[in-house]
Amino acid sequence: AKEEKENREGIGDTVWEDLLKECNVKKYPAGSRKQAYKDQKRSYQVFAKVSGQSYEEFIGALGQTDEDIQSSADDQVKARMTAKTIAIKEGLTLSDADYERFLLAFLEPEEEEDKTLKAMEKRYIEEQSCYPRDDMLIELVKEYLGKNSKMK
């Protein structure tokens, strides 16, 4: 059962990635692009600090430029827009239980870490993005795609 679940998750991820390649965004909401860029940059700054490097050293070591970070931020906005569209069309709603489940799975908190929803949300916002619910909706859509795609 666990193996089948992991296989379905992998299928959901694959279908999601293929789907995103086919999606074209006509116009990005300006505020969303700016916030996604700030979130992406902050995330890199957190990792840089943890690794004892400056932000510039860290992204340089990854072979990334500021333009790459903007492109990655645009991809995140596209993913959120796509997930919201699929959720509306398919009647999917992110329940509080699913939200918490996806958030915990994403963050993989340490044993001694505070695992309350409020603490996990705070950590996600500090380390990842200001849009934890939107990002966990992506996980719900991936799960849905994995469960509902036809295996070849």
What are these language model-derived features?
Residues 1-152:
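Extended, charged alpha-helical "arm"/coiled-coil substrate-binding scaffolds
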